[in-house]
Amino acid sequence: MPNPPEISTEARRQALAKAVDHRKQRAEFKRELAEGKRFWREALDSEVEAIQRMRIKELLESLPGFGTIRAVAILDRVGISHTRRIQGLGSTQRAKLELELKGR
């Protein structure tokens, strides 16, 4: 297995700080979603990189009344991979997901 690319200590520190910031942003968004302060559609329409890189399964599991089983069932019905990220949704997948979540 090849070695990872060599980067400076400063570049590594910046990348780690960015990763921590993105995790905090996603956690805050999911918390607000669970509390009903945000709507799931905001994630699909978001241009924030941290939100765009969230997995669809995580988004669904954050909705009130949803758990892993319900989230996986919806993903299977709609034909979306369990590891698909918001930014990777195709237009057909997005339309099917929106139809499935209509009224929630």
Task: Describe these PLM feature segments.
Residues M1-S62, T68-R104:
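Structure-specific DNA junction-binding interface
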